[in-house]
Every structure is written in structure tokens, then in C-alpha cells.
Regions:
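Histidine/acidic residue-rich metal-binding segments in metalloenzymes
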Residues: 49-52, 56, 84-110, 116-177
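Divalent-metal coordination cores built from histidine and acidic residues
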Residues: 1-106
Length: 177
């Protein structure tokens, strides 16, 4: 099983806004035409469900599962702006997380060390992780800090635990060192 979508980046989907260029660059770099029998290196889907349908119809040599990445969703809705989302933007992100989980994403992931995930405040993640909690899905996080760059290792662990407690989601800390 190949698990994609870790650390907040699910370059496969959902793809919209600023996430389109970022995802197309990744796909061109890694050659999806070979894996998905595509005639050219372009994305032929926008939603998570469309991506999974493409895998089913084109076939894949790998058994692929994916989480839906916060960074991809945030880039698609807000771009790479270092700011809090508006009420409408957070609602759009909730919808994308929900639709992706309903379509087959195994969970919701964040990469809070990397832009654009690093621009998100804890309350934004609590709301979006709450969507995963309601669907009994996992939340995995590449924490905000693993040293002393911003909030420290212990601060990052505390933030991860708080997200779980406040949202009710199961938490997996990726790369705990």
C-alpha cells in the first residue's frame, strides 16, 4: 500500500486555485503519465473523487490510498497568503475536507511546518480536523516545530494534543523525533 497525502500535501486532489500550478509541477516532476497511462502530464480531475475514479478507470501498478492535505486545500481556497481565513473561506475548506473524506480519503493531514500550513492558526485546524472527527477519520500532523524555530517541540506536541481534544479527532504525530 502506498499512502499519499502526508504532511498536508495531497497533490492529487482537491485541485483548485493556487494548488493547480503547484500540483501540476509535482505531477510533471514525477511522471503521472506512466502511472496513470495519461497521454500528457496534465491533471484531468479537480476533486478527490474524480482522482480516485481516474485511478480506477486508468489502472495503477500501485495500491494507492491517500489522506486529504490541509496545505493543498488551503492553497486552493486562500492561496499562499499569510492570514486567517474568512468565514466563507473556512466554510469552503470544510466542504472540501468533507467531500474528500466522503470520496475515500483515509484522513486529514497537516504540514504545519511548511507554507501554507504554517500560516494556519490552531483554531483553523481544530475546525477542519473536526470534520474528520465527525466521519471517524484520522488526523495526522507534521507538527509546527520539531526544534526551537517557532513554538518548540513541546509546544508543537501540546498543540497537536489540543487539536485532538478540541475537535474530538484521533491524532497521529508524524516524524516525532
Amino acid at each position: 500500500l502506498e499512502l499519499a497525502g502526508n504532511c498536508g500535501m495531497s497533490f492529487c486532489a482537491p485541485v483548485q486555485g493556487a494548488a493547480v500550478e503547484q500540483s501540476e509541477q509535482r505531477w510533471q516532476m514525477y511522471g503521472p503519465d506512466i502511472a496513470l497511462n495519461q497521454p500528457e502530464n496534465t491533471l484531468h480531475w479537480k476533486s478527490f473523487g474524480d482522482y480516485l475514479d481516474t485511478l480506477d478507470s486508468k489502472g495503477s501498478t500501485l495500491n494507492i490510498a491517500s489522506q486529504v492535505g490541509h496545505g493543498t486545500i488551503r492553497a486552493g481556497v486562500i492561496g499562499f497568503d499569510d492570514r486567517a481565513p474568512t468565514v466563507d473561506e473556512i466554510a469552503s475548506m470544510e466542504t472540501l475536507v468533507s467531500e474528500s473524506l466522503d470520496a475515500g480519503a483515509l484522513g486529514f493531514s497537516t504540514g504545519l511546518f511548511y507554507a501554507p500550513g504554517s500560516y494556519a492558526r490552531t483554531d483553523e485546524i481544530v475546525v477542519l480536523a473536526g470534520v474528520a472527527a465527525k466521519k471517524n477519520k484520522l488526523y495526522s500532523t507534521h507538527m509546527r516545530d520539531e526544534s526551537n524555530y517557532s513554538i518548540s517541540l513541546l509546544g508543537s506536541i501540546e498543540e497537536s494534543i489540543a487539536i485532538g481534544r478540541l475537535s474530538g479527532v484521533r491524532v497521529q504525530i508524524s516524524h516525532l523525533k
